């Protein structure tokens, strides 16, 4: 597959306003666009999907109309548009309920930005993808795969460029990318640098020039550190966790939706380490499971429901299906269940984890996917063939033009990033390698250990203030 759709010219599309309302001092307008399913083969594939973008602007009763108005909501803000790209893959952007929800909205509105929250294709109010849709609309896994190949970062960016051309064709805009959204932002820089005024990234410097294997070797190392920190803070959880694992292995525990609670699925709960408060959150869940087992010899329905919905792999299946594919680009690149293949011995579940050695530490894993999930997660059981196709595919579209990225400088398209020293998902180690090899002339960083991966949410004002200081400073 070529890097760029042949003769790609962003269209100027009409759009529908599917909702518009005022919440105190903000106006929220939901804009719906019909875009090509496949940008690479539009001559033979005429299918369309819907993309919804949520436009948020400052509202003053004496100046603005209640409903969406193109002139006052788009034209008047055309020089200060900020597109927010959500993390994931496979998660929608938030639907704002106030200037403080999401927390990072207010700092942007204070700077007079119009903020466009994109529901990336396959998520939220855009044409969604879930197991039922894939099973009901396609005859086999090959057809499913041909469809979802169009839901990667490159297609997301073609959507962005199409929307920009439909709203502010003669202007540049800024982009704010959180986590996977940061990866998408750098893809945007690769394809359409002329469309970007500036790029802000939080916890999302992509591992340019690296393979999935490189990524997981790095993330296992920091996940090990998080496990040690967890057990140091809650030493009694060493025996509690081993007790829970032994009970899980001795039982057939069925979750409310029919999924299975196995020791492998239990191990996935370590994904929560990556956010501020994640260690404490996991401790609370471990304590509840342990108390359930000790007092009733079973895990309560409420606790099982919490475990079932803890990670989002079933409600957002692209998060499972594309977890490793986001690291694949170009001919010959494939993942082949990289996290599974690179799993260190001390993360592998053994008999000592099943209660036979109460002092051994059971290591939880991080943001990783494994073949066993297909059997343990109810919504994934019908996607086995599709998952295998994805993990063995070797002809992915290219997501980054490394030469173009290398040649970019801060004077052309400035990049500023909040880089978290203890980021479980996007490791500081890899970010520094990428900075040296590809972004040394274009990237300024706010490096901190005050926040984990969710710094944009928990420290919005400080994080964004620092990023704008980096953009505006002449002395860095």
Residues covered by each model-derived region:
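An N-terminal hydrophobic leader/cap segment in hydrolases
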Residues: 1-35
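Gly/Pro-rich cap/lid or specificity-loop segments adjacent to the active site
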Residues: 21-49, 53-258, 372-374, 378-390, ...
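Alpha/beta-hydrolase fold active-site neighborhood
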Residues: 253-393
């Amino acid at each position: 597959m070529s890097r760029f759709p042949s003769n790609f010219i962003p269209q100027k599309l009409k759009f529908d306003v599917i909702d518009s309302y005022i919440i105190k001092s903000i106006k929220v307008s939901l804009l719906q666009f019909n875009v090509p399913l496949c940008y690479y083969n539009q001559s033979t594939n005429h299918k369309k999907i819907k993309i919804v973008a949520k436009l948020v602007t400052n509202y003053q009763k004496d100046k603005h109309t209640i409903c969406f108005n193109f002139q006052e909501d788009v034209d008047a803000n055309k020089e200060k548009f900020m597109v927010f790209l959500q993390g994931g893959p496979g998660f929608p952007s938030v639907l704002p309920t106030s200037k403080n929800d999401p927390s990072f909205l207010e700092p942007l509105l204070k700077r007079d930005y119009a903020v466009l929250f994109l529901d990336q294709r396959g998520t939220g109010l855009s044409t969604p993808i879930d197991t039922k849709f894939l099973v009901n609309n396609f005859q086999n896994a090959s057809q499913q795969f041909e469809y979802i190949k169009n839901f990667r970062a490159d297609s997301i960016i073609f959507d962005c460029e199409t929307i920009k051309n439909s709203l502010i064709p003669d202007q540049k805009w800024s982009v704010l990318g959180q986590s996977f959204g940061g990866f998408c932002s750098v893809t945007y820089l690769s394809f359409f640098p002329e469309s970007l005024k500036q790029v802000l990234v939080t916890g999302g410097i992509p591992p340019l020039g690296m393979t999935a294997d490189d990524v997981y070797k790095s993330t296992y190392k920091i996940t090990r550190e998080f496990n040690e920190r967890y057990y140091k803070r809650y030493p009694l959880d060493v025996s509690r966790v081993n007790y829970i694992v032994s009970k899980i292995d001795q039982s057939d525990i069925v979750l409310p939706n029919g999924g299975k609670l196995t020791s492998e699925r239990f191990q996935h709960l370590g994904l929560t380490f990556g956010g501020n408060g994640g260690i404490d959150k996991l401790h609370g869940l471990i304590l509840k499971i342990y108390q359930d087992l000790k007092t009733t010899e079973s895990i309560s329905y409420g606790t099982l429901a919490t475990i079932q919905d803890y990670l989002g792999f079933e409600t957002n299946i692209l998060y499972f299906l594309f977890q490793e594919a986001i690291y694949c680009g170009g001919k010959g690149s494939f993942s082949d269940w990289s996290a599974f293949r690179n799993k260190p011995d001390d993360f592998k579940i053994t008999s000592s984890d099943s209660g036979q050695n109460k002092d051994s530490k059971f290591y939880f894993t991080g943001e990783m996917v494994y073949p066993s999930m297909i059997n343990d997660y109810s919504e994934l059981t019908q996607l086995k063939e599709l998952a295998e196709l994805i993990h063995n595919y070797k002809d992915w579209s290219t997501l980054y033009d490394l030469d173009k990225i290398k040649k970019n400088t801060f004077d052309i398209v400035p990049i500023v990033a909040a880089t978290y020293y203890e980021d479980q998902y996007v490791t500081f180690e890899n970010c520094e390698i990428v900075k040296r090899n590809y972004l040394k002339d274009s990237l300024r960083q706010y490096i901190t250990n005050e926040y984990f991966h969710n710094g944009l949410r928990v420290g919005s004002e400080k994080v964004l203030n620092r990023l704008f200081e980096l953009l505006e400073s002449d002395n860095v």
